[in-house]
Swiss-Prot record:
Quaternary structure annotation from Swiss-Prot or TrEMBL: Interacts with Orco. Complexes exist early in the endomembrane system in olfactory sensory neurons (OSNs), coupling these complexes to the conserved ciliary trafficking pathway.
Gene name tied to this protein: Or30a
This protein's record includes keyword Membrane: yes
GO cellular component: cation channel complex; dendrite membrane; plasma membrane
Pfam families per record: 7tm_6
Function comment: Odorant receptor which mediates acceptance or avoidance behavior, depending on its substrates. The odorant receptor repertoire encodes a large collection of odor stimuli that vary widely in identity, intensity, and duration. May form a complex with Orco to form odorant-sensing units, providing sensitive and prolonged odorant signaling and calcium permeability. Involved in the behavioral responses to propyl acetate and anisole.
Subcellular location: Cell membrane
GO molecular function: ionotropic olfactory receptor activity; odorant binding; olfactory receptor activity
Record's protein name: Odorant receptor 30a
Length: 377
C-alpha cells in the first residue's frame, strides 16, 4: 500500500531528476518558476542570432556564440516541449511507476537485484550529468575573463543600447544577469537528458526481467510453464507499448538534438584550434566533454535497448523448450517471432538511435570540421 501511494517524484530510479523538474514547474506543478526560468532564455536566444549576424567581435567569440545559440535553442525546445506535453509526460511517468512498483513487489531475488542495479546506474548517470552541467556553467561565466577583449558570457543583441553593452555599468549588470541564468538553464537541459536516460534504462530492465523469466522456465513444473510463457507475452506487449509511448513523446526532439549535436560539436572543434589562451582551450574541452558525454550516454543506452530486446528471443530459445508439449512450444515460438523485431528509440520516427548512427554522425562532423579548418587556414 505504501509503494502504491508513492509520489512519482520520489521514485528512487529517478534520483533528483523529477524533483528538479517539479521545483522549476516543468512537470507536476504549474507556477511562476517556469516563466522565470524560460522567459529570459527565449528572449536571449532570439537576440543571439541577431548578434551573430551583426557581430564585429573576434572569430573565436563569434564561433563560441554560435555554439551557445544552438545550445540555447536546444534548451528552449526541451523546456517548451515539457510545458506543452506536460500531461502526456506525467501519464507516461505514472505508467512507469506502476511497472516499477510491480517489480519492487516481486519475490524473485534476481529481479530485486536487477532493479537495484538499474536504480544505482540511473542515479549515478544523473549525478555525473549534473556535475558536468555545473562545470559547464562555470565555464560559461569564466570563459570571457580569459579573453583579450571585454565580452559577455552569452552573445546578445540589445536594441538602442547595443553599442553600450560593453561599457560600465551596463556590462557588469548584464554579466551578473547572465551568470544567474546559467544554473537555471542547466536545470532545464540536464534533467531532461537524465529523464530520457532513465526511461530507456527502465525499458532495458524490463527486457532483462523477461530474459530472466524465460531462462527460469526449466525450474517450473510442466503445468506452470504455459502460464508463465503467456505472462511473458503479455509483459512483452507492455514493454513494446512502453517503448512506443516513449518514442511518441521524444522522437522529434531526438531529431532536433541530432542536428544540434552535430552543429555544436563541429563548432567546438573549430573553437579548439582558434582558442587564444590555455585557459580558453581547457574550457572549450570541458564544453566538448559535457556535450559529447550527454549524447554518448543517450546513444549507448538506446543501443543497449536495441540489442537487449533481441536477447529476449535468445533467452526463449535457450530454455528447455524441447521438453514442453506441442501447444506450449507453439506459444513459445510465437513469443520468439514477436522478439525478432527489435525495440528501438527512434530519431525523427524513422532511424533507430544506436552507436552505429552515432559513429556515422561523428564521421560527418569530422569531415565538415576538416573542411572548415582548411578554409580558415
Amino acid at each position: 500500500m505504501e509503494l502504491k501511494s508513492m509520489d512519482p517524484v520520489e521514485m528512487p530510479i529517478f534520483g533528483s531528476t523529477l524533483k528538479l523538474m517539479k521545483f522549476w514547474s516543468y512537470l507536476f506543478v504549474h507556477n511562476w518558476r517556469r516563466y522565470v526560468a524560460m522567459t529570459p532564455y527565449i528572449i536571449i536566444n532570439c537576440t543571439q542570432y541577431v548578434d551573430i549576424y551583426l557581430s564585429t567581435e573576434s572569430l573565436d567569440f563569434i564561433i563560441r556564440n554560435v555554439y551557445l545559440a544552438v545550445l540555447f535553442t536546444n534548451t528552449v525546445v526541451r523546456g517548451v516541449l515539457l510545458c506543452v506535453q506536460r500531461f502526456s509526460y506525467e501519464r507516461f511517468i505514472n505508467i512507469l511507476k506502476s511497472f516499477y512498483i510491480e517489480l519492487l513487489q516481486s519475490d524473485d531475488p534476481i529481479i530485486n537485484i536487477l532493479v537495484k542495479e538499474t536504480t544505482r546506474l540511473s542515479v549515478l548517470i544523473s549525478r555525473i550529468n549534473l556535475l558536468m552541467g555545473c562545470c559547464t556553467c562555470i565555464g560559461f561565466v569564466t570563459y570571457p575573463i580569459f579573453g583579450s577583449e571585454r565580452v559577455l558570457p552569452y552573445g546578445m543583441y540589445l536594441p538602442t543600447i547595443d553599442e553600450y553593452k560593453y561599457a560600465s555599468p551596463y556590462y557588469e549588470i548584464f554579466f551578473v544577469i547572465q551568470a544567474i541564468m546559467a544554473p537555471m538553464g542547466c536545470c532545464m537541459y540536464i534533467p531532461y537528458t537524465n529523464m530520457v536516460v532513465t526511461f530507456t534504462l527502465f525499458a532495458i530492465l524490463m527486457c532483462r526481467v523477461l530474459q530472466h523469466k524465460l531462462r527460469s522456465l526449466e525450474k517450473l513444473k510442466n503445468e506452470q510453464v504455459r502460464g508463465e510463457i503467456i505472462w511473458c507475452i503479455k509483459y512483452q506487449l507492455k514493454l513494446s507499448g512502453f517503448v512506443d509511448s516513449m518514442n511518441a513523446l521524444n522522437t522529434h526532439l531526438h531529431l532536433v538534438e541530432f542536428l544540434c549535436f552535430g552543429a555544436m560539436l563541429c563548432v567546438l572543434l573549430f573553437s579548439l584550434i582558434i582558442a587564444q589562451t590555455i585557459a580558453q582551450t581547457v574550457i572549450v574541452i570541458a564544453y566538448m566533454v559535457m556535450i559529447f558525454a550527454n549524447s554518448v550516454v543517450l546513444y549507448y543506452v538506446a543501443n543497449e535497448l536495441y540489442f537487449q530486446s533481441f536477447d529476449i528471443a535468445i533467452a526463449a530459445y535457450e530454455s528447455n523448450w524441447m521438453d514442453f508439449d506441442v501447444d506450449t512450444q507453439k506459444t513459445l515460438k510465437f513469443l520468439i517471432m514477436r522478439s525478432q523485431k527489435p525495440l528501438a528509440i527512434l530519431v525523427g520516427g524513422t532511424y533507430p538511435m544506436n552507436l552505429k548512427m552515432l559513429q556515422s554522425l561523428l564521421n560527418a562532423i569530422y569531415s565538415f570540421f576538416t573542411l572548415l579548418r582548411r578554409v580558415y587556414g
